[in-house]
């Protein structure tokens, strides 16, 4: 099987941008508006996204799809309020002609996106877009892309990221993917397969056949490889799966069982938990030399390690103090410091790509909650709670988390997203039950 992410299929031309870099409800010191991302409530920015114009019916269909994907991406972020196309007073037919800004202002649009799809002689698609500040009439951004027609959704995600960054001042997260565990069948005979999809739930593909149980997939920093656990021949082993070639290999041959693998930020090492003599300790393996270094040596269960973005520290789960808590220590080993002190137990810690938060699962009072805290343990915040929420993973920009929720009984788990302020909880569509998500870095 071959699963090519086709990064090389996408060629981006030089950008043509003019005017401001930000737009939103509140004007800045230069008279330009900006979406203010804060920890409190956010007033979503009204934005108009007409269908991209095109010269042929088939290209027009793709143009409509591109505008719909952009609309859905921005709406799901919680920072934008796309205006219903039925309210539009102007029909965009030529993106080279400035829009009638008064018509867009009259429907309360503060930003406007126009675009065009053009079929090239070699069969490729040329996609162009313009981002406008309706109040000032300034073009904030513009770019053109060339790609094979089958990758039009990729174009839509990249344009969404461009818009998000121009209007918020922060990197987007739409041109990314999620690896997860697809689950099917009755609860007592559940089949679990490794699956890959776009961050919005589209383009699902299955990487394993479901003959063996798979768990805890994680991306490499390059997006090319996935590490995961598989229960083959009765014991869990850690594997590497190459997304582009479909090939896989066992990561070492360890005595006992191995759990919770995760890449280092430079992609050169894998950190994991190995069970030996009834205890589980943390080990790191150099992927080139295959040399393994032990990081912890305690009569406890140390598991679920996660690197800080700069690779200098790790956070992990340990019951060395009685019940599971979160600890931090140098990535090379050494003294571990406990950072979780609330009621209940803490598990599945993961460091934000920004380095500002550690997300976790917290169990207590019959509830499983998803929360975040600062790396020093301060500022603990519960984002969502319920019967069984677990497995947080950060978007590439660190502003959104994905997790899975299992209602119990005969039903199965589903994926959800929530932002770091606890707002905008949304279900992520998947073909079946889904658990153990892991968000990739940006693809571009």
UniProtKB/Swiss-Prot annotation:
It is found in: Periplasm. Residues 1-31 form the signal peptide. Part of the Tol-Pal system, which plays a role in outer membrane invagination during cell division and is important for maintaining outer membrane integrity. It comes from the Bacteria. Belongs to the TolB family. The keyword Mitochondrion does not apply. Gene3D superfamilies: TolB, C-terminal domain (2.120.10.30), TolB, N-terminal domain (3.40.50.10070). One of its GO terms (biological process) is protein import. The keyword Signal applies. PANTHER family: PROTEIN TOLB (PTHR36842:SF1), PROTEIN TOLB HOMOLOG (PTHR36842). The Tol-Pal system is composed of five core proteins: the inner membrane proteins TolA, TolQ and TolR, the periplasmic protein TolB and the outer membrane protein Pal. They form a network linking the inner and outer membranes and the peptidoglycan layer. HAMAP family: TolB. It comes from Rhodopseudomonas palustris (strain ATCC BAA-98 / CGA009). Its main location: periplasm. This is Tol-Pal system protein TolB. One of its GO terms (cellular component) is periplasmic space. Keywords: Cell cycle, Cell division, Periplasm, Signal.
């Amino acid at each position: 099987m071959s699963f090519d992410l086709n990064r090389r299929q996408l060629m981006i031309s030089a950008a043509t941008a003019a005017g401001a870099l930000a737009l939103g409800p509140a004007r800045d010191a230069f008279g330009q508006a900006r979406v203010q991302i804060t920890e409190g409530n956010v007033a979503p920015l009204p934005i108009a996204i007409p269908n991209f114009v095109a010269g042929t019916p088939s290209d027009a269909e793709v143009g409509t799809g591109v505008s719909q994907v952009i609309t859905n991406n921005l709406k799901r972020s919680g920072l934008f309020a796309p205006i219903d196309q039925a309210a539009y007073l102007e029909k965009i037919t030529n993106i080279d002609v400035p829009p009638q800004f008064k018509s867009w202002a009259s429907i309360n649009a503060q930003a406007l996106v126009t675009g065009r799809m053009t079929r090239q002689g070699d069969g490729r698609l040329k996609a162009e877009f313009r981002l406008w500040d309706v109040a000032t009439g300034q073009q904030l951004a513009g770019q053109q892309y060339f790609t094979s027609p089958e990758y039009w959704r990729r174009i839509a995600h990249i344009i969404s990221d461009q818009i998000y960054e121009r209007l918020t001042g922060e990197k987007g997260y739409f041109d990314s993917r999620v690896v997860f565990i697809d689950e099917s069948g009755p609860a007592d005979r559940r089949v679990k397969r490794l699956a890959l999809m776009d961050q919005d739930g589209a383009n699902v593909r299955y990487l394993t056949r479901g003959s063996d149980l798979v768990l805890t997939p994680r991306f490499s920093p390059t997006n090319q490889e996935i590490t995961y656990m598989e229960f083959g021949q009765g014991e869990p082993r850690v594997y590497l799966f190459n997304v582009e070639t479909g090939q896989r290999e066992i990561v070492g041959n360890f005595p006992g069982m191995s759990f919770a693998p995760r890449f280092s930020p430079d992609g050169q090492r894998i950190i994991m938990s190995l069970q030996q003599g009834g205890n589980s300790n943390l080990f790191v393996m150099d992927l080139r030399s295959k040399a393994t270094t032990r990081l912890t040596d305690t009569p406890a269960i140390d598991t679920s390690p996660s690197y800080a973005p700069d690779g200098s520290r790790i956070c992990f789960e340990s019951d060395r103090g009685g019940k599971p808590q979160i600890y931090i220590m140098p990535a090379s080993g050494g003294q571990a410091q406990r950072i979780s002190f609330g009621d209940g137990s803490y598990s599945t810690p993961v460091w934000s790509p920004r380095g500002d938060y550690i997300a976790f699962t917290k169990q207590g009072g019959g509830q499983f909650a998803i929360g975040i805290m600062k790396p020093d343990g301060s500022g603990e915040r519960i984002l969502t709670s319920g019967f069984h929420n677990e497995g947080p993973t950060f978007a590439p920009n660190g502003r959104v988390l994905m997790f899975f929720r299992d209602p119990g009984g005969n039903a199965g788990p589903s994926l959800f997203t929530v932002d770091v302020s606890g707002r905008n909880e949304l279900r992520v569509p998947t073909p079946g039950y889904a658990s153990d998500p892991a968000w990739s870095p940006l693809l571009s």
